[in-house]
Amino acid sequence: MNFKYSFIFLFFIQLAIRYNNAKITVDTICKGGKLIQMSNHYECKCPSGYALKTENTCEPIVKCDKLENINKVCGEYSICINQGNFGLEKAFVCMCTNGYMLSQNICKPTRCYNYECNAGKCILDSINPNNPVCSCDIGKILQNGKCTGTGETKCLLKCKAAEECKLTGKHYECVSKPQAPGTGSETPSNSSFMNGMSIISIIALLVIYVIVM
């Protein structure tokens, strides 16, 4: 009886964690990645060599070929597992995490299997996670549930003072503002060299002044 209640408790804990992770908002902090915006949703984008383990956490991608890489990220929403019989035989496989399945070589939410959006991607409805919906590429908008319309989407990302929101490919992201010509600071080595030359010039002028006087 205790085991039964423990199992139910763990099940709801996992469900709560998953539901919480699925809510990526404009205030979400992406661990190891950066927040991007499409037309209807936000998501975390990982740098090269990293992939999403959960909706807001990027981890290094490993090659699924040895025991120490078990349960580590081997692709987007996928982890390395050992399918060997009771550990006696090694059969390392990169498999989609719970709630995702392989579709066109990408781990997508199970509810999004074979759900086409045209110029966009399938995501789960933030209000009803059982419903697949389309989030369009920037420049496209929903039309009859698909990303077939043309329209503008305003960037709502909260970029830092030294950043600006920029359309990168098919999404918005915060990037560093370009420096105006001539406003960039000198490198430390150049600055030190120039300071040294200034001091030498001043000393030389003083010596010449003393000799002349």
Curated annotation (Swiss-Prot):
Highest taxon of source: Eukaryota
Localization of this protein: Cell membrane
InterPro entries linked to this entry: EGF-like_dom (IPR000742), Pvs25/Psv28_EGF (IPR010423)
Residues annotated as signal peptide: 1-28
Glycosylated residue positions: 190
Membrane topology: Lipid-anchor; GPI-anchor
Entry GO CC: cell surface; plasma membrane; side of membrane
Predominant location: membrane
Domain EGF-like: 30-59, 60-108, 108-148, 151-175
Chain residues in the propeptide: 191-213
Keywords: Cell membrane, Disulfide bond, EGF-like domain, Glycoprotein, GPI-anchor, Lipoprotein, Malaria, Membrane, Repeat, Signal
Record bears the keyword Cell membrane: yes
Pfam families: Plasmod_Pvs28
SS bonds (residue pairs): 64-80, 74-94, 96-107, 112-122, 117-134, 136-147
Residue positions bearing lipid (GPI-anchor amidated asparagine): 190
Protein name stated in the entry: 24 kDa ookinete surface protein
Organism in which the protein naturally occurs: Plasmodium berghei (strain Anka)
Classification lineage: Eukaryota, Sar, Alveolata, Apicomplexa, Aconoidasida
